[in-house]
Amino acid sequence: MSKKGFTLIELLIVVVIIGILAAIAIPKFANTKQKAYITAMKSDLRNLVTAEEAYFADSNAYTATVTNLKFQSTTSVSTPAITTGTGAWYATVSHSQVTTPASCGVGINTTNPVVAGASEGEPVCQ
């Protein structure tokens, strides 16, 4: 009579291999949600830049009021805190699920409120 099937040792080896692969893969995907939240904040700021520039093209001034821009933030991203000056503005946002970085910011014709050396119009998080 011939026996068919796997031995206990073979099954244990397979379980150990799966465990090793899981130990490698899980840390790689652990901060995926965090990256998605940060991307949502940056995307909102890019959309805000477009809305502010469109408003500026129509009225020759920037606005600190989000309702004037007809701008809607992504879910869980705070309403942008916009500060305007003469021909310049900057804004910051935060996300309710993100603790680090605390906020993201963008500036036009002024220093970025989050990272001083950032490129103009480029959202940066810190």
Please give the residue ranges for each predicted region:
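Conserved alpha-helical elements of the SDR catalytic core
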Residues: 25, 32, 52
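Conserved short hydrophobic patches within well-ordered secondary structure
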Residues: 16, 38, 90-91
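Aliphatic-rich helix starts adjacent to a transmembrane/signal segment
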Residues: 28-45
